[in-house]
């Protein structure tokens, strides 16, 4: 049995005992019941994910998958493909938005080259797991073989396992890849069965003619390849991206290890859809970090029945929204763990 299937087989339901105990404790804390709103439900959900009545999330990390896309040759992005390796080097220098926000919340940034179209210089903080020098142009042929798609998911699982083995107890999903909103839009359109025009946005800032071209490219690719909406591996192989597959693996790996995983923006959302088709039980381990302004993101969370924690008009990717949401997850758990109960504080309860 390969790593992907064995990981899927390990994903079970949330721990009802831990969640029930957490809810009972929430109701005994020195506050009116429900007065902390979604923080209370979030802490209870994380208790169910981790199997601990009073979970403590002290070692967060964001895994940033980087890869290139052959479909970029169709003029679907406002930026050239060489920006992908340039931004990876920026991540490694600590100068990108994800680095700043990760430092702010105390999260480690793990950068993975899963498919950048050029060779990157060795760096102690770069995980080199390159499967190909980018995907094929899916407007002309499938983005990758089914075997490569499965390998991409396996890379993500392995990265999640390595992080968790090192003590990470909260994961976030990040990515970098010019033209990856095109691949993500194709994935989302395929799995949610929505028209490409409903789930395709401007990405890095293309104009009206660029948007029309982007939608047309996606529509033609979906018509050409006919991806199976119920088979995330097929969708990934035909119209996805290597970093999208890698993030799907991160999500599956986290779920199998009972570690909460915060979903970032639109590209990470596409990865979450793929993970959910492969292992529906994995959805319970996903925390929707934020709502991107990218057009199809709302469709992702609607399909997964998840409610994002933040709505800040962000559309950068990299894991930026997810990392900010990590601090909310930590705060929710601290409320559950560190607040006194009525009995402990000597405070009278509601009559």
Curated annotation (Swiss-Prot):
<dbReference type="InterPro" id="IPR036087">
    <property type="entry name" value="Nict_dMeBzImd_PRibTrfase_sf"/>
</dbReference>
<dbReference type="InterPro" id="IPR017846">
    <property type="entry name" value="Nict_dMeBzImd_PRibTrfase_bact"/>
</dbReference>
<comment type="similarity">
    <text>Belongs to the CobT family.</text>
</comment>
<comment type="pathway">
    <text>Nucleoside biosynthesis; alpha-ribazole biosynthesis; alpha-ribazole from 5,6-dimethylbenzimidazole: step 1/2.</text>
</comment>
<dbReference type="InterPro" id="IPR003200">
    <property type="entry name" value="Nict_dMeBzImd_PRibTrfase"/>
</dbReference>
<dbReference type="Pfam" id="PF02277">
    <property type="entry name" value="DBI_PRT"/>
</dbReference>
<keyword id="KW-0808">Transferase</keyword>
<keyword id="KW-0328">Glycosyltransferase</keyword>
<protein>
    <recommendedName>
        <fullName>Nicotinate-nucleotide--dimethylbenzimidazole phosphoribosyltransferase</fullName>
        <ecNumber>2.4.2.21</ecNumber>
    </recommendedName>
</protein>
<dbReference type="GO" id="GO:0009236">
    <property type="term" value="P:cobalamin biosynthetic process"/>
</dbReference>
<dbReference type="GO" id="GO:0008939">
    <property type="term" value="F:nicotinate-nucleotide-dimethylbenzimidazole phosphoribosyltransferase activity"/>
</dbReference>
<feature type="active site" description="Proton acceptor">
    <location>
        <position position="318"/>
    </location>
</feature>
<keyword id="KW-0169">Cobalamin biosynthesis</keyword>
<comment type="function">
    <text>Catalyzes the synthesis of alpha-ribazole-5'-phosphate from nicotinate mononucleotide (NAMN) and 5,6-dimethylbenzimidazole (DMB).</text>
</comment>
<dbReference type="InterPro" id="IPR023195">
    <property type="entry name" value="Nict_dMeBzImd_PRibTrfase_N"/>
</dbReference>
């Amino acid at each position: 049995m390969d790593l992907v299937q064995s990981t899927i087989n390990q994903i079970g339901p949330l721990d009802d005992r831990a969640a029930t105990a957490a809810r009972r404790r929430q109701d005994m804390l020195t506050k009116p019941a429900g007065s902390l709103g979604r923080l209370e439900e979030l802490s209870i959900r994380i208790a169910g994910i981790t199997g601990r009545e009073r979970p403590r999330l002290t070692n967060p990390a964001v895994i940033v998958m980087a890869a290139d896309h052959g479909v970029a040759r169709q003029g679907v992005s406002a930026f050239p493909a060489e920006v992908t390796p340039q931004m990876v080097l920026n991540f490694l220098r600590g100068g990108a938005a994800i680095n700043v926000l990760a430092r702010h919340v105390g999260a480690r940034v793990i950068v993975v080259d899963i498919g950048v179209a050029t060779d990157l210089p060795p760096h102690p903080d770069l995980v080199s797991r390159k499967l190909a020098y980018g995907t094929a142009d899916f407007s002309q042929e499938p983005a990758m073989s089914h075997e490569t798609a499965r390998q991409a998911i396996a890379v993500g699982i392995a990265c999640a396992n390595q992080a968790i083995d090192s003590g990470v107890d909260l994961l976030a999903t990040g990515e970098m890849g010019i033209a990856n909103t095109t691949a993500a839009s194709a994935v989302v359109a395929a799995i949610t069965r929505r028209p490409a025009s409903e789930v395709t946005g401007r990405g890095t800032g293309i104009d009206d003619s660029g948007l029309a071209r982007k939608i047309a490219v996606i529509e033609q690719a979906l018509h050409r390849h006919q991806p199976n909406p119920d088979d995330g591996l097929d969708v990934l192989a035909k119209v996805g991206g290597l970093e999208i597959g890698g993030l799907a693996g991160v999500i599956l790996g986290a779920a199998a290890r009972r570690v909460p995983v915060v979903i970032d923006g639109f590209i990470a959302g596409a990865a979450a859809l793929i993970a959910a088709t492969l292992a529906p039980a994995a959805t319970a381990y996903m925390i929707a970090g934020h709502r991107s302004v990218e057009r199809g993101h709302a469709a992702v969370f609607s399909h997964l029945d998840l409610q994002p924690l933040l709505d800040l008009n962000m559309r950068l990717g990299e894991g930026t929204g997810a990392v900010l949401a990590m601090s909310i997850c930590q705060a929710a758990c601290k409320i559950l763990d560190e607040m006194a109960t009525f009995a402990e504080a000597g405070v009278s309860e509601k009559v």
